């Protein structure tokens, strides 16, 4: 939607509204009643929406983070490896990294404890390319370094066990 000055609004689909969005994404009255905001420091063209994500499948983005997406009108504009907010008939709103296949799209979580899965292109209702995000959780690089160090130590332990068996 556009404000009285002709500036593009960004509608927010929060977790509460996300359940109704799958059925009302094209309902002007539903969209009109969503919370709206503008970001003067983001200069963009096109239609944008903000989605509050839930779950831990896209860590380090945490549940409650807001992803701003630009509407993508055609599958030809999708780029492998980029992240998108996708509205599907089956799963509703999902936020994933993608790989475009012939008749389907592979959805890939950044959190590797979740397996990738494919959806048919015919199941896709809307696609929004992620262009920015806001989070209430600030990154803690110390935790990331500890995580990497633990993985490396585990690999060394596994190598030592293999050497001892040989």
Task: State the predicted function of each range.
Residues 23-24, 39-108, 113:
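Feature for secretory/organellar precursors and membrane-associated catalytic proteins
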Residues 77-81, 85-166:
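C-terminal regulatory/effector modules of DNA-binding transcriptional regulators
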Residues 1-63, 134-166:
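Short, positionally conserved secondary-structure boundary motifs
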